[in-house]
Regions:
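Secondary-structure boundary elements
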Residues: 3-7, 11-81
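Residue-level recognition of tetratricopeptide repeat
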Residues: 164, 197-198
Length: 216
């Protein structure tokens, strides 16, 4: 069964209503139409990917905030907003870009780093097109074909499932901090179902379970 990144990411973001789901999938389609360059069919896949990246930054240059949106629906709304709000954090920007890439016929992956820019865990897009492997740093306006992570010894490639797992992990942490332990646990467990080797989700789940025991 095909793993639909956009649908799964929206579900992980908290959308359950089919009408809402269709609405946001339609918004993704609108963004593709908005940012697809004229004559795109004549461009190489690499050029299409670059032009999409540049168009997103041109339209919303105030894109990145470390604690910004990570839910796909919120990132989409921020991208479409005329209020100049920040679009998202590294996870949100990467999911948005990868979803749009799929809609123009390009399969992007994600790259997970344990410590990027000296600030901790980080995700970005990685493209494998023809003989090229290109990092796309979604938090930087000049981030297409970014070279700064090439020598990182802890580069870990993520597929769509692992990327969606990070949404569940982020939601779990958000709910944990709000004291909604039961819902937090569900999200950590969903993260681990999609990415059983995700140590961060496993650790946070263990911390949560210990906390729940002490408060029984």
């Amino acid at each position: 069964m095909v793993f639909d990144l956009a649908k799964k990411a929206l579900a992980a973001s908290g959308l359950r209503n089919e009408d809402q789901m269709r609405d946001y999938l339609g918004k993704l389609d609108f963004l593709v139409l908005q940012f697809s360059p004229k004559g795109a069919r004549g461009f190489s896949l690499l050029t299409r990917a670059q032009k999409l990246f540049e168009a997103l930054w041109k339209e919303r240059p105030n894109r990145y905030q470390p604690q910004g949106h990570f839910r796909l629906n919120e990132v989409i709304d921020a991208q479409l907003s005329n209020k100049g709000q920040v679009v998202g954090n590294c996870l949100g920007l990467t999911i948005l870009y990868n979803c749009l890439l799929k809609r123009i016929g390009i399969e992007g992956e994600a790259l997970h780093l344990e410590n990027a820019f000296g600030t901790g865990a980080h995700v970005l897009t990685v493209l494998r097109i023809d003989d090229f492997t290109i990092d796309v740093e979604n938090i930087l306006p000049e981030g297409f074909d970014y070279k700064g992570h090439k020598k990182d010894p802890f580069r870990l490639t993520w597929g769509d499932k692992e990327l969606v797992a990070d949404i569940y992990q982020s939601r779990g942490t958000e709910l944990f901090e709000k004291g909604q332990f039961g819902e937090a646990l569900k999200n950590y467990e969903m993260a681990l179902k999609l990415n059983p080797r995700y140590e961060k989700a496993e650790l946070n789940r263990a911390i949560l379970l210990d906390r729940m025991k002490t408060e029984e």
